[in-house]
């Protein structure tokens, strides 16, 4: 079966935004106008097609990115809806990895919010070209031009409007298309499915000309030939303008900007046109980096129908009817359902039972999947997020995704004995789906701990245990993931020698322990020369240190950001063994870290609080009491914005306190930023409590 849509007419796009910018509503409207859903799903009444997990319907926020396929003007658009809540940035990060372009949705009133900055940074990191859609133009306080300025100032980007609004708030009726220089006015009777193209209203002609001039100037900068034409006073034609916008959008030197109101069904078709005109096809983005597992050399995988199959698993979901779904972005070649595929990350072969095309929560069986597509594979057992699937003869390992360590842990206890076993299985499944969620057993108490990126993240996990897996669980107090590190350099030797009849044990090492930059992790350097320690024992020393660093000397927390150099030692022909050197390495590390000025580290959260001015003093006083460092204060739409770094341990229960302090008018967002040193008086309390 040949492919229906050629590769250059495919768009893999994500819709990314802050909570409440109207992202899910925008996705819904796209599905409505491209003919996928016959009744528009409203988030307000909990019926949106994209939000298909029960909790999402209740909370009105999007948690898992559903991948949906739709068609517009002979192009196939694969749409990935991404969550806007900060605890789910891992979801955004994974979808960014497999997108070719993105639509960033901003609220015309709220503008650039802290979460939008995070998502914007992630899109920059993966080099994803994007267009901006300013939504909710019908709301009181809507201001398109404010958002344009905020994108320049806060996101340091270059937004170039390609349409501007006609009216605002309740007088918003349509947009002026600056490329065609026409007014587009939507018809309310047809739910926005029809619109009229008219001449530009006389009162807006001046503004339209001014913005058209800005657009043409930005376009001319993209190409020398266009620049000459522009400077020579010649008009650029529509084709040239479109080509220039696309060039600038792909190299990210300009960001095309549009507006509309998804809820009121205005501006969605012009957004779809822009997706097709300006966002890249799979053939127009840079080739994906990978590694040849045989030679460990870097290779590039080009998006094309030619060549052997290669794809990346970017999401795993458990579906109540078909079991585990593995969402895969195909970069090269094609694959038929029922065939075998090689997981080069795990070095295992897997059989693909079925291939499913997802329409948010409806599914369609397909026989074959081609390059550039996004598709759900059924029947894979060992494949996890970030694994590469390919042809065994032409193996390649695509760039791995990096997942953050959890910053918060909560103990979970099953209510009954029957729940105990079910809980283990359920947590395992959830950890497979979400790489930023971890499950572990606390050694001292035997309790099960779950770790994640924030309170909401773990709340939803516990909620899913109850709902999807019917496991009743009690949760304990949240615990913070402290770390330990060292502040000074120390050299130590340790000789481990045991003689008690029969074969003895002998391992002798000299190590140097040095602090490293925050966030740089652990490094082991072997400087043994002349065979004073045989090379087969060196990995044992490293292993001993790695085991010992899981339990720091201060309070038993993992030790991070240090370098160990093994520079001398001795061995015994008969008595030396791997075990002896492992113990020697571990003891030397413990002794060295006691002497290297160990300190306790805690997760510091980047907190942004938005409050009316009259509560400003109370809020700042409260953040100071929580050991916060205030970084900046801004104004946004008549509210005060306080930016601060606050230790996570001080932020538990903050939402309730903020609500009561501001009579429900304050809001806040927080995300993990870095690990900071705990002040000595507080560190002392924590250490005493741990050693209790």
Swiss-Prot record:
Keywords: Cytoplasm, Elongation factor, GTP-binding, Nucleotide-binding, Protein biosynthesis
GO biological processes: ribosome disassembly
Domain tr-type G positions: 8-283
KW Zinc (keyword) present: no
Gene Ontology CC terms: cytoplasm
UniProt keyword tRNA-binding, yes or no: no
InterPro entries attached to this UniProt entry: EF-G-like_DII (IPR053905), EFG_II (IPR041095), EFG_III (IPR009022), EFG_III/V (IPR035647), EFG_IV (IPR047872), EFG_V (IPR035649), EFG_V-like (IPR000640), G_TR_CS (IPR031157)
Gene3D superfamilies in UniProt: 3.30.230.10, 3.30.70.240, Elongation Factor G (Translational Gtpase), domain 3 (3.30.70.870), P-loop containing nucleotide triphosphate hydrolases (3.40.50.300), Translation factors (2.40.30.10)
MF terms in GO: GTP binding; GTPase activity; translation elongation factor activity
Residues reported to bind GTP: 17-24, 81-85, 135-138
A Pfam family annotated for this UniProt entry: GTP_EFTU
Localization terms from the record: Cytoplasm
Source superkingdom: Bacteria
Protein family (similarity comment): Belongs to the TRAFAC class translation factor GTPase superfamily. Classic translation factor GTPase family. EF-G/EF-2 subfamily.
Known function: Catalyzes the GTP-dependent ribosomal translocation step during translation elongation. During this step, the ribosome changes from the pre-translocational (PRE) to the post-translocational (POST) state as the newly formed A-site-bound peptidyl-tRNA and P-site-bound deacylated tRNA move to the P and E sites, respectively. Catalyzes the coordinated movement of the two tRNA molecules, the mRNA and conformational changes in the ribosome.
Name this polypeptide is given: Elongation factor G
Protein source organism: Helicobacter pylori (strain P12)
């Amino acid at each position: 079966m040949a492919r229906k849509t050629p590769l250059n007419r495919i768009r893999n796009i994500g819709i990314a935004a802050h909570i409440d910018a109207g992202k899910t509503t925008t996705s819904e409207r796209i599905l409505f106008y491209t003919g996928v859903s016959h009744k528009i799903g409203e988030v307000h009444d909990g019926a949106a097609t994209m939000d298909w997990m029960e909790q999402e319907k209740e909370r009105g926020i999007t948690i898992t990115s559903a991948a949906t396929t739709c068609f517009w003007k002979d192009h196939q658009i694969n749409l990935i809806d991404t969550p806007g809540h900060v605890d789910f940035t891992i979801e955004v990060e994974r979808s960014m990895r497999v997108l070719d372009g993105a639509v960033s949705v901003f609220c015309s009133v709220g503008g650039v919010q802290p979460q939008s900055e995070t998502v914007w940074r992630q899109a920059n990191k993966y080099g994803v070209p994007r267009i901006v859609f300013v939504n909710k133009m019908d709301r009181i306080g809507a201001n398109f031009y404010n958002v344009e300025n905020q994108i320049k100032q806060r996101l340091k980007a270059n937004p170039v409007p390609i349409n501007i609004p006609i009216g605002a708030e309740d007088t918003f009726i349509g947009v002026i298309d600056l490329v065609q220089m026409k007014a587009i006015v939507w018809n309310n009777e047809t739910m926005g499915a029809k619109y009229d193209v008219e001449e530009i209203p006389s009162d807006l002609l001046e503004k339209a000309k001014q913005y058209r001039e800005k657009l043409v100037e930005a376009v001319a900068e993209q190409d020398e030939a266009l620049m000459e034409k522009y400077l020579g006073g010649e008009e650029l034609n529509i084709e040239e303008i479109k080509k220039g916008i696309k060039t600038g959008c792909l190299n990210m030197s300009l960001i095309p900007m549009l507006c509309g109101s998804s809820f009121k069904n205005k501006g969605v078709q012009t957004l779809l046109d822009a997706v097709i005109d300006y966002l890249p096809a799979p053939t127009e983005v840079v080739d994906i980096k990978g590694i040849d597992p045989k030679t460990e050399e870097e290779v590039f995988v080009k998006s094309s129908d030619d060549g052997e199959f290669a794809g990346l698993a970017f999401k795993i979901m458990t579906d109540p009817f078909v079991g585990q779904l593995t969402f895969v972005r195909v970069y090269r070649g094609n694959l038929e359902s029922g065939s075998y595929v090689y997981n080069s990350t795990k070095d295992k072969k897997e059989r693909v039972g079925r291939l499913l095309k997802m329409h948010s929560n409806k599914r369609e069986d397909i026989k074959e999947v081609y390059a550039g597509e996004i598709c759900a594979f059924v029947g894979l057992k060992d494949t996890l997020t970030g694994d590469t699937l390919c042809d065994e003869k032409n193996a390649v390992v695509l760039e791995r995704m990096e997942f953050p360590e959890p910053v918060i842990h909560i103990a979970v206890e099953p209510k009954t004995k029957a729940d105990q076993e079910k809980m283990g299985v359920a947590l395992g499944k959830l950890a497979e789906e979400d790489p930023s969620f971890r499950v572990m057993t606390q050694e001292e108490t035997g309790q099960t701990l779950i770790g994640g990126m924030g309170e909401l993240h773990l709340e939803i996990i516990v909620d899913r245990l109850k709902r999807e897996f019917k496991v009743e669980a009690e949760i304990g107090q949240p615990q913070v993931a402290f770390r330990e590190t060292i502040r000074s350099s120390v050299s130590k030797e340790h000789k481990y020698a045991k003689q008690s009849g029969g074969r003895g044990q002998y391992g002798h090492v000299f190590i140097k322990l040095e602090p490293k930059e925050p966030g740089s992790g652990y490094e082991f350097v072997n400087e043994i020369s002349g065979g004073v320690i045989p090379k087969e024992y060196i990995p044992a020393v490293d292993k001993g240190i790695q085991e010992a660093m899981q339990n720091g000397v201060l309070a038993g927390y993992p030790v991070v950001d240090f370098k160990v150099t093994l520079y001398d030692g001795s061995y015994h022909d008969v008595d030396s063994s791997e075990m002896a050197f492992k113990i020697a390495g571990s003891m030397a590390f413990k002794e060295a870290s006691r002497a290297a000025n160990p300190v306790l580290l805690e997760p510091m959260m980047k907190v942004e609080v938005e409050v009316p001015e009259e509560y400003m003093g109370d809020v700042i006083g409260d953040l100071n009491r929580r050991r916060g460092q205030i970084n900046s204060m801004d104004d946004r739409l008549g509210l005060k914005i306080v930016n601060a770094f606050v230790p996570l341990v001080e932020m538990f229960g903050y939402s309730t306190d903020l609500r009561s302090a501001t009579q429900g008018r304050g809001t806040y967002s927080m995300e993990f930023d870095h690990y900071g040193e705990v002040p000595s008086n507080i560190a002392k309390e924590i250490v005493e409590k741990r050693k209790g």
